[in-house]
Every structure is written in structure tokens, then in C-alpha cells.
Amino acid sequence: MVGRTLDWNDELGRWLKPFVDRLGHRARRRMCPLYVSGLIGPGDRKSVQPMAKRLVLGEYDQLHHFIAAGVWEASPVETELLVQADRLVGGRDAVLVIDDTALPKKGTHSVGVAAQYASVLGKTANCQTMVSLTLARGEVPVMLALRLFLPESWTSNQARLERAGVPADYRTARSKPEIALAEIDRAIAAGVRFGCVLADAGYGLSAPFRQGLTARKLAWAVGIPRHLKVYPADVRMIWPIAGRGRPRKRYIPDILSMAAEDMLANARWRAISWRSGTKGKLKARFAAVRVRVADGPPQRIRDKGQQHLPGDQAWLIGEHRISGEKKYYLANLPAKMDLRTLASIIKARWICEQAHQQLKEELGLDHFEGRSWHGLHRHALMTMIAYAFLQYRRLKTARREKKNQRAAASANLARRAPGHPRSHRSTTAAAMSPLPKMDSQRAEWPTNRY
């Protein structure tokens, strides 16, 4: 046990070196490995005091100062996380998933806390909400960013923002889609590679968000509410027939927009399986048609009042689940893409929910007990670094198992007698567990090597 634990500590120390090198001061360089290992290690609570107690090093004051009170810039470490995440799972076949996660809280003093919808509880609750970016390839997610959303009750109260230490650049009211676009820009600037941006209807409803992704030349597939308006793909702009009143000066569409669910009412639906789950293949019925989204400039159309003109062409996709639930999506993916591929891309978004759950249940994302902006974001950053390390170990183990399987298959093939040829089917690594299990008993904690 001791040997294995020391090996793990050594591996963590080596893996953390690029992050530690960006921290500057010697004390911060020593506290970072301690904090990360405290998050990964055993214990029900991953806040500063219980972690310091488990370290048995009397490090509470220094750990607390490192996370909550120290004066240091987190952005270089955040950039390093983007670089390391791209090395782990980046590529054109990766997806970037936009979502948010709620951290239930008591009281009113923790930064950003307010009565708002908490997805983890399925209702409105007193909580903090953090916009998240998750990079995923296959079934391996790595969290890239967690940025706090500030409700109006906070952005309208400068004294409250000052007490929580909110930086000046973040005191202006920003919607969740606006925060997401800013974090996407940060990821792109760091060279993170991905093929498609995915988001749920909370973001897909926002025309500026969709248009912002398109302006950045990004492929996207987002959830939308069933009532979002669209036009047929072949809608034409015509000169309106003159009637009473002043003559019209602008073209109008030759057909009115309609709700997404109505556009798919007579579509052809197909049963599609997109991946295997613990209880077998995951299936649903899908349909897709090309449309033009009603997110152009608003204009009065005949006697129907103001309507948005046709915007860019996109896929409108519907999903009928076995439970009876219906979901709708928009995607600016290529017009020649087949329905099965569209469905597979859309359903890849589920991986971020697994990442949120693991960050909370195994690494204590929602255990931070401080009230400040910097403290919350530094704690969140350390949990993301810990998560990235565990995914690094997960991928390393999978590659080793795959190599061993191939070696065994080659040996078996070599032992076969001539005259009995058999087709050789390539093997793959066994399904990987969500996160690698670490030793529950720890001989010692990582020490500073830098």
C-alpha cells in the first residue's frame, strides 16, 4: 500500500509541475499540491478545515490563505488548465459542452447567492450558479472553466460586490450566454481544439448566443424550446402587395414563421440508437428538417404584428423519448449530415452532467465555505485541476490495458498452427470507470519538489 501511494504522490507532483510553475511564490507552489491532493483524498468534506486536519501538518492557516485570502492571479493557472485539457482530449472530434451548475447555499453573504433555479434540485433555491465549459472526447470529459453568474440583486449593489471582492471587470451584469461566449473566447485563445459546441435550451434559446457562435465560425448544436419560431428552408422574400396606408419599403417572407414543434408535426421519424448504456442501447425517435431560424431583424408583417425575419439556415431536430418527453434542437451542421450523426452529436451533451456530479460528489466542488469571489473561483479551479489529473490517469490506464490486450492477441495469433487461419478482430480497452479509484489509506501527502 505504501509503495503504491508514494507512486501516486510522485505522479501527482510531476503532473502538477506546469501549474505550480505558474504560481510564482514559494508558499503558493507548496500549497497547490497539498490542496489538490486533499480534494482527491478520502473524507466526506473537502473544505479547507477538514482537509487541513487530514493532512496532519497544521496547515490550515496557510491553506486558507492560499485559497481565500492570498493576493495572486489565477488566470495563468486557468490558461495552463486549458492547455493540459487540450492535450488530454482536444481534437476535431471533441465537443465543447456549455452548461451551468448550482451550488446550494445557506444565508445571503456568499458571493452570487440568490433565489434562482437550481438544476441539481429541480426547483428554485438559494444557491450560486456557475457557467461551465466541458471539453469531451468519447466518454472522457475534462472541465475547462467554471465562472460565477451574478444575479441582478448583486450587480445592482456595488457595496455588496465590494465586500465579496468581485473584480471590476466582472461587476457589470452579464447573462449566462454572455459569460459562456467570453469563456469560449478564452479557450480558443489558448488553442483548445474541438469540433462542435453543445448547449441546452437555456442557452440555445438565446439568438445572440447562437449568432455569436456562428460569428466565431464554430459548429454548434443546441437545445431550444418547442415554441421557438422557424421558417421553411425554401422561404422567399417578396415585395408586399400594396394595400391601404403608406406603401411598404421592405421585403417580407412569403410565409409566416411557425413553432418548431409544428414544423416537425408531419416529419418522418426514425428510431435511432446513439450509444450503449448500463441497461443496453439508448434509443429514441428522431426527425430532422432544414429550416431558417426566425432570428433576423424584427419587422411588421401584414396584420400579424412584429415578427423576426428569416435568419441563417440550420437543422431543426426533434427527439421523442421512450418516456413520452419531447425535445427540440437547432444545429448549423452541414446540410448533408445524416440523421444518425446528428442525433449522436446532440446526445454527446450528457457527459457534462457526469462531470458536474463527479466534481461535487468526489472532489467537493460545492464544499467551499468562504464568501469571496476569489476564494470560490480558486477552489473551483483546484477541483478542475484535480479532475483533469484523474482523467489523465484514467486515459493512461486505458492505453496500458489496450496495449496489453493487443500484445495478448498477437501472442495467441502466433501460437495458432499453420493451416488454420482465423480472422483477427482488433480489441479495445474495457469500458473505463467514471474516475479511477484512489487509495483510501494514504501513507503521506505530496510534498513540494520545485
Question: What are these regions, as identified by a protein language model?
Answer:
Residues 1-27, 39, 150, 157, ...:
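A short, flexible helix-boundary coil/loop motif
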Residues 2-198, 202-222, 226-229, 236, ...:
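Conserved, well-structured functional cores that handle cations and Mg-NTP chemistry
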Residues 30-34, 49, 327, 340-343, ...:
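Non-catalytic, well-ordered alpha-helical scaffold segments
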Residues 35, 323-349:
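Extended, non-catalytic structural segments that build the interaction scaffolds
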Residues 39, 43, 55, 67-70, ...:
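Generic structural signal for hydrophobic core residues of well-folded globular domains
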Residues 98, 102, 203, 251-262, ...:
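Short amphipathic alpha-helical "interface-anchor" segments enriched in bulky aromatics
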Residues 129, 351, 355, 377, ...:
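Catalytic-loop motifs flanking and including active-site residues across diverse enzymes
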Residues 134-136, 277, 319:
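A generic structural motif
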